[in-house]
Every structure is written in structure tokens, then in C-alpha cells.
């Protein structure tokens, strides 16, 4: 059984958090985590010309589902906003923003890597947090089960925290509850936080597939079943359901 991510200090439980929320499995788990540990939670998403923009609709379904799941979470869940980050789609040539096949380059990076995406997302989220008087940012990046993106690494996030605080004269804290969890452990975390109801909500409402497919339902959710994101989610589900745990 996966260990639960370390609880945030008790002194933060009367504070607010801003969750970078895409509508995917990872950010859904992070949103539930934040709702468990912070007194007020707001969310921010990004429209950047992604092929799988169905995730923007999934966000609304997940938010509604979380409100219905637990009254205390509904009371803590605050405003949501989606920011226009379309410039990423304009300047990038990737399989997430263009009609292109998913492959790997000479560095071993998949063509789904959007250069600067998470760097920009954290910066925009920090600006929102500054305006809203929020000190804690929560994101679902990890470097265990991930696609090799350099902007998901722990070193990147730690460096960003320093840079954002220097550049904004703030004391922001960037939380990454999934950083050292694999996908099986992320499913376990959802179960620990919200029971089978949160697992079911994640299966039915959250979206992962890079191709944006919602026509085919699998036991782990909707998607093509073939892209790297679907395969990671499916493999994690299998280990979670069949008890083999983390590899």
C-alpha cells in the first residue's frame, strides 16, 4: 500500500490554496488533497490550444462531482477560472497542439512535450495567487510515472519556487503531492481521500487521453487506450485494482 503524501503543517489548515487543475487524473487527486488540507481552495485551468481540449469540459464535471461528494469539500471549494494561454499553441509544434503523431526525439523527449508549458502555468498561477492573497500552489506534476517532461521534475519545481518568490517578493509554497507517486499510488491516494466514490468520479469524469477521445470507455476511464497518457493510466489502474502496487 502506498504511503499517503506527507500532511501539510497544521498551521496551513486555515489558509487557502490554488490548484492548477486540468481535469485529468493527477490534478483531480491533487484537488481532493488540497480540499482535505486547506480551508479554502480555488482552481485555475489553462486553454492553450491543446488537442485534448475536452479536458476543459471534464474540469466542470469533476468540480461538480467533488461538490456533490462531500459537503465539507463543497464548502471549501471556491472560485474557478480558465486562463487563455493560447500563445503556447501558436509558438509550439507538438503533438499536443498540432495534428501530429506521437514520437520521440533524439533527446528521448516525446513530441507531446510543450516547451515552457508548466513554467508558464506556474507563473500565471502565481500571478493569480498574488491577486487573490493565496500563498499555496498545488500541482499534479511528478517524476515517477511520467512522460519524461523536464518541467515536471522536482528540481524544476523547487527552482521555480525560488524564482517566483524572488520575482514577486512573495512567500509562495509550491506543493506537488504526487511527485514521488506512480499512477497506481495516485489511484490509491484518491481512494484514501474520497473512497470508492472519488475513484469512480475520477474514472467517469476526468480526462487523460492525448487525442481527446471520449467515445471508448475502459475500466480506468475514457480514451484511445494507446497514447502514452492512456497507457500510464491503464497500467496504474491494473496495479491498483489487482494489488501489485508500485513497481
UniProtKB/Swiss-Prot annotation:
Family: Belongs to the QueC family.
Gene Ontology molecular function terms on file: ATP binding; ligase activity, forming carbon-nitrogen bonds; zinc ion binding
Cofactor annotation: Zn(2+)
GO biological process: queuosine biosynthetic process
Binding site for ATP: 21-31
EC numbers: 6.3.4.20
Metabolic or biological pathway, per its Swiss-Prot or TrEMBL entry: Purine metabolism; 7-cyano-7-deazaguanine biosynthesis
HAMAP family named in the record: QueC
Record's catalysed reaction(s): 7-carboxy-7-deazaguanine + NH4(+) + ATP = 7-cyano-7-deazaguanine + ADP + phosphate + H2O + H(+)
Organism: Halorhodospira halophila (strain DSM 244 / SL1) (Ectothiorhodospira halophila (strain DSM 244 / SL1))
Pfam entry (one): QueC
Enzyme class, broadest EC rank: ligase
Cofactor: how bound: Binds 1 zinc ion per subunit.
Record Gene3D superfamilies: HUPs (3.40.50.620)
Residues binding Zn(2+), per UniProt: 209, 224, 227, 230
UniProt keywords, alphabetically: ATP-binding, Ligase, Metal-binding, Nucleotide-binding, Queuosine biosynthesis, Zinc
Function, in words: Catalyzes the ATP-dependent conversion of 7-carboxy-7-deazaguanine (CDG) to 7-cyano-7-deazaguanine (preQ(0)).
Protein name (record): 7-cyano-7-deazaguanine synthase
